[in-house]
A protein has these predicted regions:
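Intrinsically disordered, low-complexity regulatory regions
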Residues: 1-72
């Protein structure tokens, strides 16, 4: 039986798990979440649902950067 807590199947289809990529690239929460949803797109939930989740976190990050730069 697969370990659904530490190594869920929808993240373990290649040699790289999203958590390892997120850590290696030093991504923040928003960008890390986007990577996570892109990586599992179509493997856990519907691909469009997963990609829309990724898009939402990218939009959150863009808003945060714009706010930081005084554009909002």
């Amino acid at each position: 039986m697969k370990d659904m807590v530490h190594h869920p199947a929808h993240y373990c289809y290649s040699e790289y798990e999203p958590k390892d990529v997120i850590r290696a690239w030093g991504l923040n929460f928003n960008l890390g979440s986007a990577v996570k949803y892109i990586a599992r797109a179509g493997r856990k939930d519907d691909i469009l649902q997963e990609l829309n989740k990724a898009k939402q976190f990218i939009e959150f990050e863009i808003e945060a950067i714009e706010k930081e730069r005084g554009k909002v």
